């Protein structure tokens, strides 16, 4: 066995629905990645890639095959604090990155809702954040990559010389090579605070209208929606728009140290964050979540139109407020279906998505809407439009209804020319990269391939 292999292990998707048993490799250098791939080839296996294991479904699982974990590739290689760029190994997390650059007046150009994801995983999935509509996905800010191909060759790619090759790797799920290093342009910031505007809306149409109207003048924008009401109240929401502070702002230069950005250690000063998921468990049912969503609507109304200061970490990393919050969905887990649809179809498509929940009796406990702009990556999922992310509990008595709902969403996306996002998917049928190398595979790849054959 290869010295970087640790034997067979059972790995799970973050949503706790998918799992697989695989031969696991933990390389710590480019050379050990080359060694791991050689061992995989000689064993006649396929291989998937896994960073922090935060893909909701089966994108980082490979039943009966191999998985390369990037946890040992965790070094910051180079930081240019004057020019604003950083080179890191693939296993460096967003948390490690922002803590390294914020004291120098920089911030990662794109971050998801958790700081625990790895940069290699972020690039492989081409993650987006609350600023996709203005800054694009993370791939827009990648200036260089180191990639080990299936034959063991190491390629160092730069956008100045190999733009097409870089953009083919970004978002390809690691299906055309193993990413070992990433170079990123950083975002200049003058304060550790953002100026955040809160907005309340009475309906889905109003939510989308306000998001479209206010996003262009904002640096970040996101909307939470209530999926439980029927009629005109369906899709009512709370929106947040955030802006960077200028260098002459009274808060410029403040909260630039890591300690200033720490999330609170407790909820309301009473319940430790690490135990907060336990307090939510009694509400993890339809009546409880209807009440939770209503409470959020009511509590948000007095803040309508008000602005306040919030640290970057507090604004961006909502999923880290309650560590391990997915455990509220034990023992069966959750799935997320995220619909990306063109702008002109969004109002009708999202309205239909909520209607289908009422028809099937399967309600989303969390709905999040974002504005997007298109990109030109080979594995693009982002339109000039909107996305709607929907979290569903997995219940044994409702599995058939949940499957029907997800198949209806597949049909809906196909009808409007929409797309799926691999990092979140556990149930849909999406498009695979055209230049996929057969050495690289995953449970998601095989599921999508089977779904495409069924549709053909």
PLM regions: where:
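Glycine-rich N-terminal segment of FAD-binding domains in flavoprotein oxidoreductases
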Residues: 18-113, 125-131, 223, 369, ...
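Short, conserved charged micro-motifs
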Residues: 32-35, 96, 205-207, 345-351, ...
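Structural signature of FAD isoalloxazine-binding scaffolds in flavoprotein oxidoreductases
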Residues: 57-77, 129-152, 178-185
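C-terminal substrate-binding/cap subdomain adjacent to the FAD-binding core in PCMH-type
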Residues: 124, 143-348, 355-356, 363, ...
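Short, hydrophobic beta-strand segments
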Residues: 335-339, 385-394, 429
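Extended C-terminal subregions enriched in glycine
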Residues: 346, 357-360, 394-405, 409-421
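Activity-critical C-terminal alpha-helical subdomain
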Residues: 401, 412-456
């Amino acid at each position: 066995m290869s010295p970087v292999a640790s034997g067979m292990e059972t790995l799970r998707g973050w949503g706790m629905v998918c799992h697989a048993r695989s031969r696991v490799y933990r390389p710590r250098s480019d050379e050990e990645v080359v060694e791991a791939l050689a061992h995989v080839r000689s064993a006649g296996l396929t291989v998937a890639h896994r960073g922090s294991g935060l893909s909701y479904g089966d994108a980082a699982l490979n039943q009966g095959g191999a998985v390369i974990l990037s946890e040992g590739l965790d070094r910051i290689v180079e930081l240019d604090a004057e020019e604003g760029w950083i080179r890191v190994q693939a296993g460096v997390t967003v948390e490690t990155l922002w803590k390294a650059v914020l004291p120098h007046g920089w911030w990662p150009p794109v971050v998801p809702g958790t700081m625990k994801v790895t940069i290699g995983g972020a690039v492989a999935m081409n993650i987006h954040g609350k600023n996709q509509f203005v800054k694009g996905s993370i791939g827009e800010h990648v200036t260089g990559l180191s990639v080990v191909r299936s034959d063991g060759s190491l390629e160092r790619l730069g956008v100045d010389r190999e733009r097409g090759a870089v953009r083919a790797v970004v978002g390809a799920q690691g299906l055309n090579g193993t990413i070992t290093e990433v170079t990123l342009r950083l975002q200049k910031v003058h304060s550790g605070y953002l100026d955040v505007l809160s907005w309340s809306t009475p309906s889905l149409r109003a939510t989308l209208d306000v998001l479209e109207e206010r996003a262009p003048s904002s640096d970040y924008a996101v909307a939470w929606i209530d999926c439980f009401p029927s009629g005109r109240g369906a899709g009512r929401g709370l929106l947040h728009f955030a802006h960077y502070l200028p260098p002459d702002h009274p808060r410029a230069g403040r909260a630039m140290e890591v300690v200033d950005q720490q999330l609170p250690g407790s909820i309301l000063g009473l319940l430790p964050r690490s135990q907060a998921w336990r307090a939510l468990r009694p509400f993890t049912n339809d009546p409880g979540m209807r009440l939770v969503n209503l409470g959020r609507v009511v509590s948000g109304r007095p803040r309508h139109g008000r602005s306040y200061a919030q640290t970057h970490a507090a604004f961006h990393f909502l999923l880290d407020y309650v560590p391990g919050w997915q455990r509220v969905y034990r023992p069966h887990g959750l799935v997320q279906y995220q619909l990306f649809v063109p702008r002109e179809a969004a109002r009708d498509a999202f309205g239909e998505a909520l209607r289908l929940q009422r028809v099937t009796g399967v309600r989303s406990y969390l709905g999040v809407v974002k504005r997007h702009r298109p990109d030109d990556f080979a594995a693009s999922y982002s339109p000039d439009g909107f996305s709607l992310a929907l979290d569903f509990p997995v219940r044994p008595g409702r599995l058939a209804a949940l499957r029907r709902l997800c198949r209806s969403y597949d049909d809906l996306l196909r009808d409007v020319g929409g797309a799926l996002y691999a990092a979140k998917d556990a149930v849909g049928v999406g498009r695979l990269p055209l230049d996929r190398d057969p050495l690289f595979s995953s449970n998601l790849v095989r599921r999508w391939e089977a779904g495409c054959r069924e549709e053909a």
